[in-house]
């Protein structure tokens, strides 16, 4: 309540009451007129306090939130309080008469705070000594629920019903343990031996007493197991787990992951006793669950906020706090934190990389150590067994120093006939293999001599005889395999010796024509300046460009010359060996004047320029293919480039041609001769001898068997025709017999009628016209016999529903013949039958 000076009236309104508004507080000893005081309400007008004017708009005029105005008990309490307040107001401020006290019809129960507490009770509840928190007070961040949990972090807390059941169970267990009487109390005891006494003492069960902590642990395990395995138990009580499903949680060690604290309580003790306790507690837990209709025994808080009108929702969100706008200070602090985070991450990444580098160094040192130890063991083995020998590769593995490669040496070609590329490569390969074999034999011989010398000096051999024999056998086997391999590869070229395979020239290269073709005399010409032989003469090509323009392409000449003596360095050998393809002065597009200063040519030495140009154009296919030893030119890929000016080659050109030289210029008819010989040999060849084992000839068909087979087939066909004819004949006979029987019956009836007419005529001849009038015409009889008509014609017999068969022409002919025979037979039989009937009639008349 506020002072009278701050009272809110209808004519004067005060400012909005907030947490910063200063209010006068009245104590119990102050005299305050409660009837004159008024309740201060929240100011909801828009012009209240600026930016906070809309902060408490959800507070109603009664001081209650708008969401709680729908609760009926709160509305009843507010209306009752307003009625009580209006009834207690005096009629006028000056009246002293007190109104009768009215009781609240409905109120919200709250603790009574109107009375005074006695000094004795106050001194017991509130001590005068002030509590001082110790310095070593233990602080932790666990919540109240976590702190009040039982064993294993299970949050089950026993209530009054559990306490009553536990007290009854413990009292019964303690009472039952004292009810067992001894043999002396029951009467004269039996004499029992010492072992039996110990057995009886062991058989007596110990009293089962369950502590409160143990009871809460067992109930908590039941609740957690049911919550995980039967969450919908409140919908169907049949899902309640039996004790057999939960018994393993007590008879065997429980998993720490099952408990909320992830720790097994140390106070459990014996598992057998724990299982017995759980077996006794299970019926009580089951009954409690059934009473709760499958719900948890301990009531759970309702956190479901889907229904806003539910008053039992816990921790309901009253209002949504508006997010504050970001300020500059906040941005600055965020940037500082981000910068600090980036620096820490960079430092961590750098440290991680340093650690990785050191680990790699450690692994590298360990690998080098292992390699050094392996080399040392290998060296010790070689030193201990000298007979094994030492190759260049093994020496390189031990010392780690590469073997010095000797300078390249080309063997001199002797003889009168120049070698081709195939002969040269095979000769080089054989020479290399021979040198390798000689070197290996020499090393083995030296190793054997050293071993013998060391054995003679020491008096005994270092290597056992068995090991020597084994090594010799292995070496011999290896040599045999190498020799066999060499024989198999005698007619093959190893690509390892010349691994470079030049690309085939393009079609445009073949279109060039050299000057040798145009002017054969120019083929013997040499360079006028140097006198070198021309390897690749000038060539031209005519092609047609765009717009029909005819263009002439040319290629300069390539000369072969070797400058100086044969070099010994491998780096200088290609320059001396390969042909020079640098252009000459005569190959320029236009001649230079004598007075022109060649400053740009003096900047770089001609030797370096020539070397660079040769290396650049050596493998150019368009230029003329790969040129060099073993690589060939575009005209002849099997040609070896050599120095034509050498004395051993030039002597073949300066001398006159011999008969053998002319024979070499003629075309080789070797292939034609071989073909002719093969044809002659095939014509004169003898027939091949008969093989020992021949495939038996196919059996010839027997004409008699074929004739018998054909005759059998004809007989089968005739038999089938006869069977078909007999079947048709049988059908015709059946039809003829049926017709004959019908005709016989008709004739018998006709004779009977004739006899009856004769008798009538004999009895009375006065009525000759009666019979004629009754049958003036020949009427067909019921039996189907045709009666004669006055004109002498006969009527066709009715079909009587018989279906007519559609037969082929040959069958119709055969059937007609059969019908004729049947009719003849039937007529003969009918004639005989008529004669018999006439004889019978004559005998009857007589």
UniProtKB/Swiss-Prot annotation:
Residues 169-204, 391-466, 587-607, 682-702, 759-804 are annotated as: Disordered. PANTHER family: ENHANCER OF POLYCOMB. Its main location: nucleus. Belongs to the enhancer of polycomb family. This is Enhancer of polycomb-like protein 1. Residues 411-426, 783-796 have a biased composition (Polar residues). One of its GO terms (biological process) is DNA repair. Component of the NuA4 histone acetyltransferase complex. Residues 180-203, 432-452 have a biased composition (Basic and acidic residues). GO terms for cellular component: NuA4 histone acetyltransferase complex; nucleus; piccolo histone acetyltransferase complex. It comes from Cryptococcus neoformans var. neoformans serotype D (strain JEC21 / ATCC MYA-565).
